[in-house]
Design a protein with these regions (language model features):
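Conserved alpha/beta enzyme-core scaffold
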Residues: 1-423, 428-432, 437-480
């Protein structure tokens, strides 16, 4: 019996109050068409599980139909910069949305435990896939966490780019799938590997953002950015396995610079699962699905966490909304828990990954007293006993975590101890640090060869400003 239905009929299968597990990853293969159809059907009061998929939560929050969500990261990086989902943030502030932000690996392990007990974490898994057949078999080029979401749910409702007669080796077999609808471009404006890329204008319309036109950076600003990237690259060791997480376009570029200069034998695993991806320009985000087509191999997100847990990852880059002198990182909120001034994107997988790796590299492009603080407002991740080395790279110095806290190993040219102290919110010991070695001609030439168009400078720009968002009541049509 055929399981193929219309998109509208598929959406009607999701009743108000349902718990939904949403597939895709960041701005890749999100079931956008299905989400819009659900919203247009005036169903609401949903509970959502996402690992992590902030644009999906943004659509549901903007429509006022999301009651609670489990999502470890509600930000994403794209052509306009880094954005924290604004409707999600607003719904949390007004009390309309109860958001829980566990470590992504905790979510994965919870899904596994529920699956292994034969139970379900969600009523439905909502997916968009590359291929389906009429019996319900699904094929996904880039599964991410989708297989696990399907296995831990009551059933799968899927949209597909194409229907074929038969899929002999399905990613998700028909017995897990309830219904399928044809929806070409059904993941747009997010990407669908093998079919189309991300549409920045469409993303912008969904979140209410616009590109802010800024003057070109001055020579001193471009020099500072190049030096920051070079100093990051110098922390990457040869013959190591190194990983980047979400919103890590800057570290990804630094890793490629290291590969072409001082660390030719490194193994780099991107968070989308691309092993040794070919980096031939400055990408606007580290979550680039197309990298999976230009790499040595792939690994899915649950297996990447397992690899780190089992000691297979040496080094990882981390960001920090705040970091204190003892190495505690805050990615959660600024201000008290009861009334935060700013809600940050969330932990992603940083707590678990930090507890498994030997070398922790922390990138803070602009050192200020408000981000290098005496005490973090929330402890998202902390130093672990397995961390043999923790290095913090800023635009002022290169810091090393010692037994008594961070100490500057070197200060950049033109930075005095007084300058450094004025930009640091914690006390530190300063034992006559060296001056950071200037960039070499080889490093500069190699960086320019990777990114001749200067896309790297856009990675350091401010966030987009709000404009009118795409109205959730607008009819969005999909070919199907």
């Amino acid at each position: 019996m055929s399981k193929v239905v219309s998109l509208e009929s598929l959406a009607q299968e999701v009743p108000s109050g349902a718990t939904i597990a949403i597939g895709g990853f960041q701005l890749s293969r999100v079931p956008i068409a299905l989400l819009h159809a659900i919203v247009e059907g005036e169903h609401s009061d949903f509970r959502a599980v996402s690992a992590p998929n902030p644009l999906a939560l943004e659509i549901l929050s903007a429509a006022g139909c999301l009651r609670s969500a489990e999502c470890g990261f509600v930000g994403f990086q794209y052509e306009d910069g880094f954005v924290i989902a604004p409707a999600v943030r607003h719904a949390i502030a007004t009390g309309e949305l109860d958001l829980r932000q566990p470590d992504v690996y905790d979510t994965i392990q919870s899904l596994r435990a529920i699956r292994d007990k034969g139970k379900q974490h969600a009523d439905f898994a909502l997916l968009h896939v590359q291929l389906a057949d009429s019996t319900g078999n699904l094929f996904i080029d880039d599964p991410y966490v989708d297989v696990l979401l399907a296995e831990a749910s009551g059933g799968v409702l899927a949209t597909t780019e194409d229907l074929v007669d038969r899929i002999d080796k399905p990613t998700i077999p028909a017995d897990r799938v309830q219904q399928v609808a044809l929806a070409k471009n059904g993941a747009a404006p997010t990407s669908c590997l093998g079919h189309y890329g991300r549409d920045p204008l469409g993303v912008r319309q969904h979140i209410g953002g616009t590109i802010v036109r800024r003057p070109d950076p001055t020579p001193s600003q471009t020099d500072a950015i190049d030096n920051f990237l070079i100093n990051l690259a110098r922390q990457v060791n040869d013959n190591e396995v190194i990983v980047t997480g979400l919103a890590s376009a800057v570290p990804m570029l630094a890793i490629e610079l290291a590969r072409r200069t001082s660390a030719p034998n490194l193994t780099y695993i991107n968070c989308i699962g691309a092993v040794n991806p070919r980096i031939e320009k400055a990408f606007p985000t580290s979550v680039e699905a197309e990298l999976r087509n230009h790499c040595d191999g792939t690994i899915e997100l649950p297996d990447l966490f397992d690899l780190a847990r089992d000691g297979g990852v040496d080094t990882m880059f981390f960001g920090a909304g705040q970091i204190d002198g003892q190495g505690n990182i805050n990615l959660s909120r600024i201000g008290p828990e009861s009334n935060p001034e700013v809600r940050l994107a969330g932990p992603a997988g940083s707590p678990s990954m930090r507890s498994y790796i030997r070398r922790v590299l922390i990138a803070v492009p602009r050192q200020l007293r408000r981000n290098l603080v005496g005490q973090v407002d929330a402890k998202t991740s902390a130093p672990a006993s397995c961390n043999e080395e923790t290095v913090l790279v800023t635009d002022a110095a290169i810091w090393h975590l010692k037994a008594n806290g961070f100490e500057p190993g070197s200060m950049h040219e033109g930075i005095s101890v007084e300058d450094l102290s004025s930009r640091t919110g914690f006390d530190f010991r300063c034992n006559f640090p060296a001056v950071t070695a200037p960039a070499t001609e080889l490093e500069l030439r190699t960086l320019r060869s990777i990114d001749p168009a200067g896309g790297r400078y856009k990675l350091f720009s401010e966030r987009p400003q709000p404009i009118e968002r795409l109205k959730t009541t607008e009819k969005v049509t999909y070919e199907g």
